[in-house]
Regions:
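Short beta-strand/loop segment that forms part of the nucleotide-sugar
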Residues: 21, 31-41, 58-63
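Short aromatic/hydrophobic "clamp" motif used to bind/position activated sugar donors
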Residues: 83
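Conserved donor NDP-sugar-binding/catalytic core segment of glycosyltransferases
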Residues: 91-125
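Glycine-rich, basic loop-to-helix element that forms the pyrophosphate-binding segment
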Residues: 61-78
Length: 243
């Protein structure tokens, strides 16, 4: 069985961490996964800290200036095998870790695997299509299970991107090692509500820059799509009475 590390990065704790723990700890207790929690402070205390005080859970409290900085620091503590990133409040679906292990074990030559995720609030399922990453965020990052050694050769997350560093890493990973494999099986229920939901325009522009730099999109296409996005956003705001 391949080594699997679940990584959660926090800037200053998160009340939703307990929700994630309920779905992750059974796999940890069964020896099927390790949970690495990278927090920029010592804010995980009390009953939650006691709850997490088991073998297989590692909490690292170090100062970080950004979420992707925290995740890069976390990756340094993983020696081998595969990892996936679960945000605070995200939960593993029933049997997810067993399915991930079975998939990896039956595909030993793949450098990574991409699974579907389900939006917790809407119930919508996002299916992975790594070959389409050059055009859109076609592999939701919570469903990506990647080789830690391969990610380290790429230098981890590019912290110059504040919103879309996850998309950048996936694009570079597929460009370097191929599309690998994917499954429409849901492994993560995604809570949402992260920074990309509140800074959509910045995220869009970062993604376009990534497509230009990594995926070799044409600059004129970037400009046109950016203008279309801004125009459509203005129309929606007017309809909502904000302009």
């Amino acid at each position: 069985m391949n080594s699997l590390t679940i990584v959660t990065g926090l800037l200053d704790g998160d009340p939703n961490l307990a929700l994630s723990a309920e779905s992750i700890l059974p796999a940890v207790k069964a020896g099927k996964a390790t949970w690495l929690i990278k927090n920029s402070s010592s804010s995980i205390t009390g009953n939650l800290l006691d709850y997490l005080n088991i073998s297989g859970v590692k909490i690292i409290a170090e100062s970080d200036s950004s979420l992707y900085g925290a995740l890069n620091q976390a990756l340094k503590h993983i020696d081998d095998g595969y990892f996936m990133i679960i945000g605070a409040g995200d939960t593993l679906s029933t049997g997810a870790v067993d399915f991930i292990h079975a998939t990896l074990d039956s595909n030993p030559n793949l450098d990574g695997f991409y699974f579907a995720i389900q939006m917790a609030k809407s119930g919508n399922i996002l299916l992975p299509r790594p070959s389409e990453l050059g055009h859109r965020m076609a592999c939701p990052h919570p469903g990506a299970v990647l080789s830690i050694s391969k990610v380290k050769t790429l230098g981890g997350f590019d912290e110059r991107y504040q919103i879309a560093a996850d998309y950048d890493l996936l694009c570079r990973y597929v460009a370097a090692f191929g599309a690998s494999g994917w499954s429409d099986q849901v492994v993560v229920n995604y809570l949402g509500g992260g920074i990309s939901d509140f800074r959509m325009i910045e995220g869009f522009l970062e993604e376009e820059l990534i497509r230009t730099r990594v995926c070799k999109s044409k600059q004129i296409e970037v400009c046109v799509r950016g203008l279309h996005f801004l125009g459509n956003t203005a129309i929606q705001l007017r309809r909502l009475g904000h302009g």
